[in-house]
C-alpha cells in the first residue's frame, strides 16, 4: 500500500517530479504517482484528496506550475501533510509557481520546497514518515551522515 502520493498538474511536470519518485524508491517507500489537475479535473482532484488518507496515503507531494493551485487545493481537502513543489514555468522560471504555493492562507498549510525541488520534497516526506517509522528515521539519518562524510572527505587539488 502506498504511503506517499506524488501528484502533479500535468504530464509535463513528470520531468521534475520523477526525481521525487527516484528518492522514494531509493529508500524503499511505496508510492503512487499520477496526474491530478486542479483545473482540468477538479472533481477528481477533490475525490482524490478526500480519499487519500482512507487509502493509506500518509504524505502528499504535489507539483504544479503556473497558477499552481494543486498543492493548496489538495491541502484544503485533507488533513495529511502536503508538500508543494513549484515547477519551473516558461515565463517566470517558476517564480509564479513558488509564490502561488507558498502564500497559503491561515489554516491551509503547504510545506513548500525550492523551484523544481522534488528531491527535497521526497526527503522531507521521508522525514515526516520517520516520525512514525523508526526504520525510515534510521535511513534518513544515515543518508545525512553519508552526505556529511562525502563533504568532509572532499580534497581539492590546485
Swiss-Prot record:
EC identifiers of the protein: 5.4.99.18
Record bears the keyword Transport: no
Gene3D superfamilies tied to this protein: 3.40.50.1970
Family of the protein in this entry: Belongs to the AIR carboxylase family. Class I subfamily.
Annotated function: Catalyzes the conversion of N5-carboxyaminoimidazole ribonucleotide (N5-CAIR) to 4-carboxy-5-aminoimidazole ribonucleotide (CAIR).
The protein's name: N5-carboxyaminoimidazole ribonucleotide mutase
Signal peptide: none
